[in-house]
Regions:
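Positively charged n-region of N-terminal signal peptides that target proteins for export
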Residues: 1-5
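C-terminal segment of classical bacterial N-terminal signal peptides
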Residues: 13-23
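Mobile, glycine-rich extracellular loop/lid and propeptide segments
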Residues: 25-319, 324-346, 359-369, 374-388, ...
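Inter-blade linker and blade-boundary elements of WD-repeat/beta-propeller domains
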Residues: 348-359, 398-403, 452
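Flexible internal linker/loop segments at domain or repeat junctions
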Residues: 384-407
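Ser/Thr-rich, Proline-interspersed low-complexity disordered segments
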Residues: 488-570
């Protein structure tokens, strides 16, 4: 056992040192930092002792306008210096100075939808899912629902340094997304999950609205970022099958993975719901058992609204296990499932399954490695954050590691100083105590218990997750991006003298885009983004660091029996 742990740690350490040396510039370009949606941030400043003394940066302004469900992004390498990108339900997009929190540029894409939707629990609806940035072209991609005579989803591309709309964008999803004769209907489709950029194609996943109203489907739309008129899509055959999780589309770098929810009126014939779906570039889908997995009781899950797709897909590797390349799903049925991502298996038993207690929905999970092994972690509706170990065996098994009570409904994220050491699991008590919390990745011992008066946030929204860059944590909330700092954070880099040239031409922005109803997407004319003068905020008192909480003893987790699911859980 000791030799296997040593081999694992040496391999992992070499891997992460290569990663760190190749990425001296820090950029957080997407949901949960990586395509795998593991939520892992490598930052040498985040030792347990430093994390215990995290404080809010009261000199960081962070003022924005609108409700926030999306994770902020962190972008370096441009003429403005390090930037925070934030998007809101008011269809506002912001670039903020990463040190001061003042506005560098701001765009409004048009009115959000405030009424006329058949159901839902987000109001207004504008930009919900976390954007993605292509560093090579310095382009920012996101989906916005814009009100008008016809309510429509548009996929946008902006120059991340100026806010100008790139040529050929936005893409009218109503007009361009089709699959096997089915057409996209924005009125009943919600876009919650983070966008993914894989090999030059940006992927956007869609669900329905809370309440399961209207003839919605689970959709994945792919747009070629160098030729936005080239649009492909996949959708569930049956109505329903929404892709609900905050992580949206996950990828192993080649294939894309999504998890779908319950479908309707199938007559017992599987039509894409309650499943892990593997999509190839485009997206395209073979329909073969290698490219989908659904549990043998999928029809029962359909009938009781206990979606397999409560949490977005997470790609997970388990060194020493057979199979070792897996994908994780966490459902509203209280279960965790692991399947072989190279051969999903069709309607079949999973590689591993465990009852993990509590309904899991709307969030993202995390995965991480320590010297002790491989873990995944998540927050559930029962008010607990938990971690499970995945054994390096044939086949792998799922074993409870720790579970802690935590008031909120956020998606966790993970920091580590080098990839395997000093692993800390973080979560915000969104729609709960509205504070940050941190736990030892191996034991669950409390490292940070929310701080003092200054560390209280307000207006945090369900499912949301934080982001880490250069010794800081950033978190988006209603009308505000919050910044938290360690006692000795990594200095923020200065601006790059010359901006990287974009791969595509940009249009000269003028007036606010008006959604169009034509069948061909066109480049819209947009307002000239002006840099807001950077005004130094009024200095405020430096917060007193909170005392480091005494770590708690590793809890003993009692396995929970699987209860009968409620007939229709109220909130997705």
């Amino acid at each position: 056992m000791k030799s296997s742990i040593f081999v694992f740690s040496v391999v992992a350490a070499n891997l992460w040192s290569a990663v760190l040396s190749a990425n001296a510039q820090v950029n957080v370009t997407q949901e949960h930092n990586n395509l795998s949606r593991d939520g892992l941030y490598i930052d040498a400043a985040f030792t347990p002792s430093a994390a215990a003394n995290l404080t809010r940066d009261l000199n960081f302004d962070g003022t924005i306008s609108g409700n926030v469900y999306a994770q902020p992004l962190y972008i370096e390498g441009g003429p403005n210096g390090a930037m925070i990108i934030a998007v809101t339900e008011s269809n506002n997009v912001y670039a903020l100075n990463a040190t001061t929190g003042t506005v560098i540029w701001q765009r409004n894409l048009g009115p959000p939808v405030t009424s006329g939707l058949p159901c839902g629990n987000i109001n207004p609806v504008g930009i919900t899912g976390t954007p993605v940035v292509d560093l090579a072209s310095r382009s920012l991609f996101f989906d916005a629902l814009i009100d008008g005579a016809t309510k429509k989803h548009f996929i946008y591309s902006l120059n991340v340094d100026t806010g100008a709309t790139n040529a050929g964008w936005p893409v009218d999803v109503n007009a361009t997304a089709t699959y096997n004769g089915m057409t996209f209907a924005s009125l009943v489709q919600e876009e919650r999950g983070g966008l993914a950029l894989v090999n030059g194609i940006v992927y956007v996943a869609y669900s329905g609205y809370n309440g399961d109203c209207g003839a919605y489907r689970g959709w994945v739309v792919g747009v070629d970022i160098n030729n936005p008129s080239n649009v492909h899509a996949w959708a569930t055959t049956a109505f329903g099958g929404g892709i609900w999780g905050h992580g949206g589309v996950a990828s192993d770098g080649t294939n894309m993975f999504v998890v779908t929810g319950n479908t309707f009126n199938t007559g017992g014939n599987w039509m894409g719901g309650e499943a892990i779906i593997r999509l190839q570039a485009g997206p395209t889908w073979t329909g073969q058992p290698t490219d989908y997995w659904t549990p043998t009781n999928w029809f029962s899950l359909d009938n009781t609204d206990t979606d397999l797709g409560g949490v977005s897909a997470t790609v997970i590797n388990v060194p020493g296990a057979t199979p070792s390349q897996l994908v994780l799903a966490l459902g509203k049925d209280h279960n965790a499932y692991l399947v072989d991502r190279n051969n999903l298996g069709g309607i079949a038993l999973p590689v591993a399954q465990a009852s993990v207690g509590g309904i899991n929905r709307g969030t993202s999970a995390v995965t991480y490695h320590t010297i002790q092994g491989t873990y995944f972690g998540f927050h559930n509706d029962a008010g607990t954050i938990a971690a499970y170990n995945v054994t390096a065996s044939n086949p792998p098994t799922i074993v409870s590691a720790w579970s802690m009570n935590q008031n909120g409904r956020g998606s966790p994220w993970v920091t580590t100083t080098d990839g395997i050491n000093n692993v800390i699991v973080w979560v915000a008590g969104v729609a709960g105590d509205q504070r940050l919390h941190a736990y030892n990745g191996d034991t669950g011992a409390v490292i940070y218990a929310g701080g003092g008066t200054n560390e209280l946030m307000s207006g945090t929204r369900q499912w949301n997750t934080g982001m880490v860059a250069r010794g800081r944590i950033y978190f988006g909330a209603d009308n505000k991006v919050y910044a938290f700092r360690l006692p000795t954070g990594t200095p923020t880099p200065t601006a790059t003298a010359t901006a990287t040239a974009t791969a595509t031409a940009t249009s000269t922005p003028t007036t606010t885009p008006t959604p169009i109803s034509t069948t061909t997407p066109t480049s819209t004319v947009t307002p000239t983004p002006t840099a807001t003068p950077v005004v130094s905020p009024t200095p405020t008192a430096t917060p007193t660091p909170t005392a480091r909480p005494t770590p708690t003893v590793r809890p003993h987790v009692t396995p929970r029996g699987r209860p009968s699911p409620p007939p229709r859980p109220g909130v997705r």
